[in-house]
Amino acid sequence: MARVKRGVAAHAKHKKVLKAAKGFYGRRKNTIRTAKAAVDRAKQYAYRDRKVNKRNFRALWIQRINAAVREFGLTYGRFIDGLNKAGIEVDRKVLSDMAIHEPEAFGALVAAAKKALEYLKETGTANEFEGAVR
């Protein structure tokens, strides 16, 4: 059986790792063993932080909505409850964007949420709320 020499494949593999390690500090950018470890760790961090990024954005949207809603005399939790009672289904990303770029439209949503909450307070039920969007 012929001897298999991996020179070309190994060189390509090393080149791929070093390309991924470009911009790293010290030996991590040009020594195969340390570069491979650094690249593997970087991939783990990237995987983890793609999940964390989603959490961070949701928290940011909630903070923005809370700040905007407090100008109208509501808290974030009461506002979301009012929107649910009114049957308005808008996600937090859109609400945050509306609060920043379209304050009039956001104000209308806050008014609808307040109306639904007041109706709930008066009647004790939100099932027959006529202002609900269904």
UniProtKB/Swiss-Prot annotation:
GO terms for cellular component: ribonucleoprotein complex; ribosome. The gene is rplT. One of its GO terms (molecular function) is structural constituent of ribosome. Binds directly to 23S ribosomal RNA and is necessary for the in vitro assembly process of the 50S ribosomal subunit. It is not involved in the protein synthesizing functions of that subunit. PROSITE patterns: RIBOSOMAL_L20. Keywords: Ribonucleoprotein, Ribosomal protein, RNA-binding, rRNA-binding. Belongs to the bacterial ribosomal protein bL20 family. GO terms for biological process: ribosomal large subunit assembly; translation. Signal peptide: none annotated. The keyword ATP-binding does not apply. This is Large ribosomal subunit protein bL20.
